[in-house]
């Protein structure tokens, strides 16, 4: 007896799950028992039936667990939960918002209506759009037989043998939907479209503006015949009765026959008014929310010849329910007051609310909850049996609360495409379908400008078992080829798992998620080009920041200083110092105000670098002088590098003197120490000869730019005029002839192939000195020499010792002995000086000139 009762209960539950859901417009008053019997007979024994049985058992198990949990709840727990829920309900009541007017517009049987419009023969026949596998929608004639959306076509044929199933044409549906949305945008530019046939609008602002509109702006004319709409308003041509003015001629079935139009609404000009062939009438809409919605529906019907239903309420949840209240071709409004809202909610079935499906409905029915009033009465129990998100949503429904913000919640998290089809078991067809889905997904991603890293495939086999497989890649992707490469591997894995049995699918989908954000892009690996661009940006940003005295602007380059390289920061400081100097010469007192922030900037950047340094003693090689610094801390090494970088521009004379004394000490103080060379003599030495010193001292010479190399003759003449006692001499370079000839050939070809950079100073990345040239070829040669100056120095030293010089006058001998002393490497004791050849008058560039 008990087993029979259990079977009957299970059968009833299965009917509730698989039977007809009549909570849809146009399906009231049907013989559900007869319809459910046909549905059960058509599905029994099928895979779908078996899958529904399995799901029903799972739901029954959930209900059993819930009832066991309910039995263990004590009265004390229930009272505590009651206080908690009531407190939350009071908070919700305080935040209730009744100031917005939300409208939900829903087209009536949209797909079917478009097909009937384009094919008038289908107008009075039961039709559905879809296939024998699944229906997308049905018209109201078919709904009287129990045919509805989301029903297999073969079952619908059992319910209505004369049903006509029309294949869908989504391009046509999208075109009509675009026309409807153009009308909706005039009332709320920020309306939220939920699908092709429904949308939410907030007309609160429109209602405020509408109060001041004249009657002509709210008048729409109905014109018989195929004429276009003209924007110029006018007075109505014929007098209408009060009843005719109060209704929309196309919205209601009881409209007078003479007001049924065949064309579109328009506003006449004076010429068309006098045309006797034009029969016209007009409708003036009011300023209330209900009148606005009538106007919207009127315009939609006039433009598309399709009808729409609408709901008007203080929030989206109620507006959605109201739009289904008077379907088709109707509207319903809930006044913006708490009493009106609660009166509407009081007897509303819970299944009518969007978000409560058949599973939730069955679980609530097990607790004796059918209406929203009962939902509120059991609020404490629901808080103990359901998750926090669920019972919060239930309480919102029971109080008639919903969203008033039409903006979507947060950013898009994923994007997907999927397709249902008849059984596919061939691997080639599955790969081909997967490639089509990937191409469609890539197109959607590119339209939105999105890239993602996680690709997921969804597979449903013929037994209605759903599997999802995902793979995440390091870099964001968006192209069809990249997506398909990952999806194909995931699909191949599933094919191999079931081998040798084929993978029999009836649904496939591809999803992209983990979209890359701006923050993710900032942490990508830097390239060489990006590094060079960052250096150029650092120079420009430093120059711009010095033009502003605001402390907040000066702090911006400091925030980025830790991201620059060491040489970038030094180069920026050098340019800023040059800019400060030029401003002092031209702007006077104003330059002082700019100089102080630049000094503060330099001090702050130096202190920032010092704070990051470690005190551990290590061995470093100076990137400027290439000397090895042993047993020094990083801070001391940085100070050494600063001295090397700042040396040529700040303390050159003292360094030359220091080098002179140091070289004298290296030979055991056997020669007299001569005073430092005067400025005129120094210029002669720098332009007419290269003083050979240690490899470090090569960076101490003042003029190492390419200007000296390109203007050797001019500088030599200038030296002679200033100091006639300095002979015109050049340092011998006894390198191989091939090297010299190569340089000469390069020099001769340069005028034809050089690239010139204008508007930007070239700074050598090795010696960190600004080169006064715009010739990139000469600049590259200078950089090559700086990089290989160690090898060049060794060659010069080895060749210089083998050349002998004749003795000159006493004054010249003393000077040459001093130069020879600096030329000798440590440990050499010979006092013989090298003979210096006279510099040729040929203006070609030499290695000696480039080295300067």
Curated annotation (Swiss-Prot):
Gene: Polk
Any one GO CC term of the record: nuclear body
Catalyses which reaction(s): DNA(n) + a 2'-deoxyribonucleoside 5'-triphosphate = DNA(n+1) + diphosphate
Lineage: Eukaryota, Metazoa, Chordata, Craniata, Vertebrata
Region (Disordered): 252-273, 798-852
Positions of UBZ4-type zinc fingers: 619-649, 761-791
Places the protein is found: Nucleus
Pfam family, one: IMS
Binding-site residues, Mg(2+): 106, 197
Group of enzyme by EC: transferase
Residue stretches of biased makeup (Basic and acidic residues): 805-817, 840-852
Function of the molecule: DNA polymerase specifically involved in DNA repair. Plays an important role in translesion synthesis, where the normal high-fidelity DNA polymerases cannot proceed and DNA synthesis stalls. Depending on the context, it inserts the correct base, but causes frequent base transitions, transversions and frameshifts. Lacks 3'-5' proofreading exonuclease activity. Forms a Schiff base with 5'-deoxyribose phosphate at abasic sites, but does not have lyase activity.
Residues annotated to bind Zn(2+) 1: 622, 625, 640, 644
Protein name stated in the entry: DNA polymerase kappa
GO terms under biological process: cellular response to UV; DNA damage response; DNA repair; DNA replication; error-prone translesion synthesis; nucleotide-excision repair, DNA gap filling
Tissue localization of expression: Detected at low levels in heart, brain, lung, liver, kidney and testis.
Variant or mutagenesis effect after changing residue 736 to A: In strain: C3H/He
Effect of residue 692 to S: In strain: C3H/He
Keyword Amino-acid biosynthesis listed: no
Keywords: DNA damage, DNA repair, DNA replication, DNA synthesis, DNA-binding, DNA-directed DNA polymerase, Magnesium, Metal-binding, Mutator protein, Nucleotidyltransferase, Nucleus, Repeat, Schiff base, Transferase, Zinc, Zinc-finger
Top-level taxon of origin: Eukaryota
């Amino acid at each position: 007896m008990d087993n029979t009762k259990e079977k009957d209960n299970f059968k009833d539950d299965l009917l509730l799950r698989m039977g007809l859901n009549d909570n849809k417009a146009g399906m009231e008053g049907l013989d559900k028992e007869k319809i459910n019997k046909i549905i059960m007979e058509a599905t029994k024994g099928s895979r779908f039936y078996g899958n529904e049985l399995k799901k029903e058992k799972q739901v029954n198990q959930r209900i059993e667990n819930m009832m066991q949990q309910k039995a263990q709840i004590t009265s004390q727990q229930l009272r505590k939960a009651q206080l908690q829920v009531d407190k939350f309900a009071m908070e919700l009541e305080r935040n209730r918002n009744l100031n917005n007017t939300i409208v939900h517009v829903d087209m009536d049987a949209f797909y079917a209506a478009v097909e009937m419009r384009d094919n008038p023969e289908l107008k009075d026949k039961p039709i559905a759009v879809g296939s024998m596998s699944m229906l997308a929608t049905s018209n109201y004639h078919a709904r009287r037989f129990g045919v509805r959306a989301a029903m297999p076509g073969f079952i619908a044929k059992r319910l209505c043998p004369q049903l006509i199933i029309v294949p869908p044409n989504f391009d046509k549906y999208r075109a009509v939907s675009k026309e409807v949305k153009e009308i909706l945008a005039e009332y709320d530019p920020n309306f939220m479209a939920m699908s092709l046939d429904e949308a939410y609008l907030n007309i609160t602002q429109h209602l405020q503006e509408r109060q001041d509109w004249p009657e002509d702006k709210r008048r729409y004319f109905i014109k018989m015949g195929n004429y276009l709409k003209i924007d110029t308003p006018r007075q109505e041509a014929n007098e209408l009765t009060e009843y005719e003015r109060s209704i929309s001629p196309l919205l209601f079935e009881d409209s007078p026959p003479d007001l049924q139009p065949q064309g579109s609404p328009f506003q006449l000009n004076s010429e068309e008014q006098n045309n006797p062939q034009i029969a016209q009438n007009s409708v003036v809409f009011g300023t209330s929310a209900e009148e606005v919605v009538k106007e919207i529906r009127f315009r939609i019907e006039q433009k598309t010849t399709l009808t729409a239903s609408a709901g008007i309420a203080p929030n989206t949840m109620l507006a959605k329910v109201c739009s289904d209240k008077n379907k088709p071709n109707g509207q319903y409004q809930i006044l913006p007051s708490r009493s009106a809202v609660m009166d509407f909610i009081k007897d509303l079935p819970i299944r009518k609310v969007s978000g409560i499906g058949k599973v939730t409905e069955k679980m609530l029915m097990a607790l004796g909850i059918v209406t929203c009033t009962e939902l509120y009465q059991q609020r404490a129990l629901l808080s103990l049996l359901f998750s926090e998100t669920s019972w919060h949503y239930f309480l919102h429904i029971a109080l008639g609360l919903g969203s008033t913000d039409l903006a979507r919640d947060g950013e898009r998290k994923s994007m997907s495409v999927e397709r249902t089809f008849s059984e596919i078991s061939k691997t080639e067809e599955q790969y081909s379908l997967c490639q089509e889905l990937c191409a469609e997904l890539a197109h959607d991603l590119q339209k939105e400008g999105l890239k993602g890293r996680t690709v997921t495939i969804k597979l449903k086999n013929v037994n209605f078992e759903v599997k999802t497989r995902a793979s995440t890649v390091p870099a964001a992707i968006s192209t069809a080829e990249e997506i398909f490469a990952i999806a194909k591997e995931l699909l191949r894995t599933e094919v191999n798992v079931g081998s040798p049995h084929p993978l029999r699918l009836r649904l496939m989908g591809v999803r992209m998620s983990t979209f890359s954000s701006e923050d993710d892009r900032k942490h990508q690996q830097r390239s060489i080009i990006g590094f060079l661009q960052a250096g150029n940006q650092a120079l420009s940003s430093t120059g711009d920041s010095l033009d502003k005295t605001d402390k907040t602007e000066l702090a911006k380059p400091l925030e980025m200083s830790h991201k620059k390289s060491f040489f970038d920061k030094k180069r920026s400081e050098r340019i800023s110092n040059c800019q400060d100097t030029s401003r002092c010469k031209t702007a006077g007192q104003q330059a002082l105000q700019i100089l102080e922030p630049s000094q503060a900037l330099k001090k702050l950047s130096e202190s920032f670098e010092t704070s990051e340094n470690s005190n551990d003693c290590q061995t470093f090689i100076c990137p400027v002088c290439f000397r090895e610094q042993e047993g020094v801390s990083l801070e001391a090494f940085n100070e050494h590098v600063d001295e090397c970088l700042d040396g040529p521009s700040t303390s050159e004379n003292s360094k030359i003197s220091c080098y002179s004394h140091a070289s004298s000490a290296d030979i055991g103080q056997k020669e007299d120490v001569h005073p430092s060379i005067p400025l005129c003599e120094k210029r002669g030495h720098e332009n007419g000869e290269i003083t050979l010193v240690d490899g470090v001292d090569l960076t101490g010479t003042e003029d190492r730019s390419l200007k000296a190399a390109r203007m050797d003759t001019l500088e030599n003449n200038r030296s002679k005029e200033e100091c006639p006692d300095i002979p015109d001499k050049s340092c011998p370079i006894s390198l191989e002839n091939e090297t010299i000839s190569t340089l000469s050939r390069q020099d001769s070809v340069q005028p034809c192939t050089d690239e010139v950079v204008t508007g930007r100073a070239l700074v050598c990345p090795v010696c960190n000195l600004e080169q006064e040239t715009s010739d990139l070829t000469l600049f590259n040669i200078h950089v090559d020499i700086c990089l290989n100056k160690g090898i060049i120095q060794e060659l010069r030293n080895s060749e210089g010792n083998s050349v002998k010089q004749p003795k000159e006058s006493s004054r010249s001998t003393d000077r040459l002995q001093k130069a020879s002393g600096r030329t000798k490497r440590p440990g050499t004791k010979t006092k013989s000086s090298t003979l210096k050849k006279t510099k040729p008058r040929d203006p070609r560039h030499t290695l000696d000139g480039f080295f300067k």
